[in-house]
A protein has these predicted regions:
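Alpha-helical assembly-interface signal, strongest on the long, hydrophobic N-terminal helix that forms
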Residues: 2-81
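Short, conserved structural patches
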Residues: 2-3, 48, 56-164
């Protein structure tokens, strides 16, 4: 009678049926976490790309204006909505208040040897800069990873003002 339980235990130790199921059960949480991470980072990367495209559009719009600061509100709407006076945002978590517009100047001196300017155009040259600091809310995976509940997306685009 004592031999039967021992034999059963030995047979159970040699039995490989169900081993794949146990291995899959152990690996499944890591695979789910990896898949959600890829989705989260892909979503953040897509949001960054769309925001960068909006900033580029706004900077190009302002570069064609003689006075870029007179049209900064329209440019902010163009960046966020994709059109001036639009109603559907490019990215739901990005707002007009997140966009800043600034104009700076750089010198364009005349080279005494050649008599030509360093850059084509007048002196000084105006540069318009459209920047943003948007907060990507994410799906919550960043908080699990210890990166905080949100992710800040900071980007900008600069264009030389050429006027009309």
């Amino acid at each position: 009678m004592v031999r039967k339980p021992v034999l059963r235990m030995q047979r159970f130790g040699c039995d490989r049926e169900g081993a794949a199921l146990v291995e899959f059960t152990v690996v499944l949480p890591f695979l789910v976490f990896l898949g959600l991470g890829a989705f989260e980072f892909g979503s953040a990367l897509y949001g960054h790309h769309v925001i960068t495209t909006g900033l580029r559009d706004a900077a190009r719009y302002l570069a064609r204006r003689d006075d870029p600061m007179a049209a900064d509100t329209a440019a902010k709407q163009l960046a966020v909505y994709g059109e001036i006076g639009g109603s559907t945002k490019r990215v739901s978590w990005w707002s007009v208040g997140d966009v800043t517009v600034s104009v700076s100047t750089i010198a364009n001196p005349v080279d005494p040897d050649t008599g030509a300017r360093t850059y084509r155009g007048p002196d000084p040259i105006k540069i318009v800069r459209v920047a943003t600091s948007a907060t990507y809310p994410g799906l919550g995976l960043f908080a699990v990873l210890g990166m905080g509940p949100t992710l800040a997306i900071n980007t900008f685009h600069e264009e030389r003002v050429i006027g009309d």
